[in-house]
Design a protein with these regions (language model features):
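Membrane-interface helix-loop junctions and terminal tails of multi-pass membrane proteins
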Residues: 1-243
């Protein structure tokens, strides 16, 4: 059996997502006011490239969702990924919170209508579009069977570019694990948890959108995804009660 073990998947995603949390939110918080949007985006992109290319993780729940929808990973693998990513996001945020002191910027949470961020409509649009773009890059790189280092480089570059775009809009989201971890430890930001839904739901929708766009430009078809006729038949059986 060549499938990675559940423990290995969880451990890899935990480590990879922790690296992303340190390279992104960690740099933003511990660097204080000296870290600009470009430096933060570079940190996010490099950390993602390291997580994919060296650790063997994808370090983002919407990446795992897209790979599952494209039949690149199994349901078991996707669930293992999500567990590891959530734990890594929380642990990474806890590390940053523990290292931080009162002289530094206290929060790297996402949001809107505060701290100089854009309004909700702009945030939702940006999160959706950038999620589609980054997922498209990942699926295109994987479907072309590029070397892992190339997948890591292209995906990391796309992720960093997206974060540079998003930094002034909402603090850089498109990664539910990153957003959840940061929100839990954003003790000085009362909006963080209440606004968290946008940074979980919208990127997930963007992952589906990225998959659909990928199907339009790739040689793959809908039958190569979980949305093939088998899914329709299974759903029909559930509704009608047929075995």
């Amino acid at each position: 059996m060549n499938d990675p073990s559940t423990v290995r998947l969880i451990a890899a995603e935990f480590a990879g997502t922790t690296i992303v949390m340190l390279g992104g939110p960690g740099l933003m918080v511990l660097g204080g006011g000296s870290i600009g949007a470009l430096e933060a985006a570079l940190g996010f992109g490099l950390a993602m490239a390291i997580a994919i290319g060296v650790i063997g993780a994808v370090a983002n729940p919407i990446f795992s969702l897209a790979l599952f929808l494209a039949r690149q990973i199994s349901p078991r693998e996707s669930v293992s990924d999500w567990i590891g990513q959530l734990l890594g996001g929380i642990f990474g945020a806890a590390l940053v919170f523990g290292i931080n002191d009162t002289d530094r910027v206290p929060s790297a949470a996402n949001g809107w209508d505060h701290s100089g961020f854009a309004e909700l409509g702009s945030v939702l649009a940006a999160e959706l579009v950038l999620s589609v773009v980054v997922v498209l890059v990942l699926l295109s790189a994987v479907s072309q069977r590029l070397a892992t280092t190339s997948v890591a480089a292209f995906t990391g570059a796309a992720y960093g570019m997206a974060m540079l775009f998003l930094m002034r809009i909402d603090g850089g989201g498109i990664n539910p694990a990153r957003s959840i971890g940061s929100a839990l430890f954003a003790d000085t930001d009362p909006n963080a948890l209440g606004q968290l839904w946008a940074f979980v739901v919208v990127p997930a929708v963007g992952a589906v959108g990225g998959l659909m766009l990928w199907l339009l430009i790739d040689e793959a078809t809908i039958d190569d995804t979980v949305f093939d006729e088998t899914l329709v038949e299974t759903a029909s059986d559930v509704v009608t009660g047929d075995d």
